[in-house]
Structures are given as C-alpha cells and as structure tokens.
Amino acid sequence: MSHQHILTLFNLLPVATNISTWWNFGSMLLTCSIIQMTTGFFLAIHYTANTNLAFSSVIHILRDIPNGWCLQNLHSIGASMFFICIYIHIARGLYFGSYMNKKVWMSGILLLTILMATSFFGYVLPWGQMSFWAATVITNLLTAVPYLGTNLTIWLWGGFAINDPTLTRFFALHFILPFMIMSTSSIHIILLHEEGSSNPLGTNSDIDKIPFHPYHSYKDLFMLTLLLFTMMSIMSFSPDMFNDSENFSKANPMMTPQHIKPEWYFLFAYGILRSIPNKLGGTLALLLSIMILLLPPFTHTSHIRSMTFRPMAQFLFWTMITTFVILTWAASKPVESPYITISQMASTMYFLFFIINPLLGWMENKILNTNH
C-alpha cells in the first residue's frame, strides 16, 4: 500500500492554510489524555484505596516499583500540563471567536467540567494532608445547597466524615471519568469536523484549504515534541514543582494545615469562591466561574468573529488573562488583607469581561456603520 493510501484519512481532511500554533493545543490535549490514562492505569495496579494504606502505597510506588517514580511524576506533571493546554485552548477559542461553532464549544465546556472533577478526585487519592483537607473543604460546599445540602454531603462521603468509603468511591470515579473524557473528546472532534475549524482571521476558509498531512501534522508533531520535552525536563530536574509540601505528610484529621488550598489549576476558581464571605454565594460564584463560558456563543454581538481586527476587544481579553493570573496568585496566599481585596477586585473583573465584551461588540458595530 502506498504512503498516500495509508494517510488517506489525513489527506482527506482539508484545513485552512493560515491556522497558527494556537490551533495545535487540541492534539496536545489528546496526547496528555493518552499519557494520563497510560500512567494512571499502571499506578492503579499498585495503588490501594484504603485510608490506612493509600499514603504508604504511593510511597511504595515511588521507592520500590521499577520506574514507579517516573510513572507517578509523569502523572502528576501531566495533570498540570493538561490544564495549561486546556486553558490556552479555551483562551484561543475566546480570542478567535471559535465559540461561534456552538456544538463544539458546548461539548468542550462539558469536557472541561469532567476534567476538573477527575483531577479533583485524583488529588484526594495520595491521602496526604492537603489531599484530605482540600477534599473536606470542597465537598463541604455541598452543605450550602438549601434543604438537601447535609444529606447530599453525607451521601457523597458515605458517612458522617471523610473516611474509607469516600476514598474508595473517589478512586472509582477517578478511574471511570477518563473514559468519559475520551468518549466526549471523540464527540467534540466529530462535531468539529462537521463544520471545520476556524482560522485567525475569523473568515470563511473554504476557498483556501490544504490537506492536514503533511502541512499541519508536522506542525502538530513539533508542538508535541516541545510538550514532551517540557514534561521530561520538569520530571528530571524539578519533579515536585507543582506539588504542595503539606502533601508529603499523611492525612491527619486532628491537625489542620495553616492554609488549605487546592491544586494550582483550581486556584482561580478557589479565589472567586473565597472572595465572597457568604457560603452559598461563594459556591454559586465558583460554579458560575466555569458555567459563564457557556455565554459567549449567545452574547456575541460584533460583526467580526475574531479579535484579530478588534484592538479594544484585544485589550479587554488580555485584561481578563491578567485577571486570571492575579486570581491564581492571590488564592495561593493566606486569607488576609490585602489578598482578600485583590481577590474581590479580580473576581469582579473576571465576570465583567463577559458583560463588557458584547457591549464592546455592539459599540464597534455602531462605529463601523457610522463610517459607512
């Protein structure tokens, strides 16, 4: 069989000539999924979902299993890389108006939600101090639900406190959810190829398309090499870069860490949660910080799809990215002044982006119509 026939699948996929490096993160996310599922499977073989043995089983993987340290660190760093890629992927969608392809965008938000749940359950599994207390704080938010809250929390915990049943079910969920991620990813990709991907100009690219292979496949391969190189470098030189030092101690329900916080990739949402002094209000704001991403396809007002030719929208977008970084930083700090005020201001700025952006689009349309 000729080289051409083997790659028919890729050759039959027409892609816009001008898609930039920002379009490579989808394939990088798929690679992250494969790495996570492979390393996760081998870790699950040696892991014990028991409150007395979980922490010891992780130490056993690191010390006694051949290349166990490599598996564990790859899985841990891979999770951070997964979130870096998905946040860039979402930011690209917001900047270039990819959200106008509604079905793809909605399936993407569903994917993000499942991924966040998966990583939260995974963070609890080592049963370190921060694992235990982060799980306690986050699951406790369910008690904010009126009438049903307490019953829901007890049902989730499998008892009146976080204990063995909680860890067992979290392990089961952490194992099963990646299969949901893979199936939802397939739907996401199928829906994308129904219409085709957008391009940096936000124009219709039907008149100017080239085969995916070899033009874009090599570009993808280059970014994948960079991703793997970054992961291997962190694993070799600074494997605990993304870890919390509290998690090197076994979970102790009798001793609370000085500053409870989730993994770095949840800090922006945690910052929004913390900035509201009311429990129910904070929980709603936490949910809204993700669910608000469902709005842009319905609130897009500008005649121009992409922000490439919209300088004011670009300024607004980069303000939002800065806000995201500030929220992440402030949430990693103790709950004291000035961090409380900074978190509150940044949270307001974060939500304002989704309100100001459509107004800005409407204003741009007015200016363009006036000039005509």
Swiss-Prot record:
Keyword Lyase in annotation: no
Keyword Metal-binding: yes
Record's bilayer topology term: Multi-pass membrane protein
Sequence positions that bind heme b b562: H75, H174
Protein name stated in the entry: Cytochrome b
Organism: Acrochordus granulatus (Rasp-skinned water snake)
Pfam families xrefs: Cytochrom_B_C, Cytochrome_B
Gene name of the encoded protein: MT-CYB
Gene Ontology BP term (one): mitochondrial electron transport, ubiquinol to cytochrome c
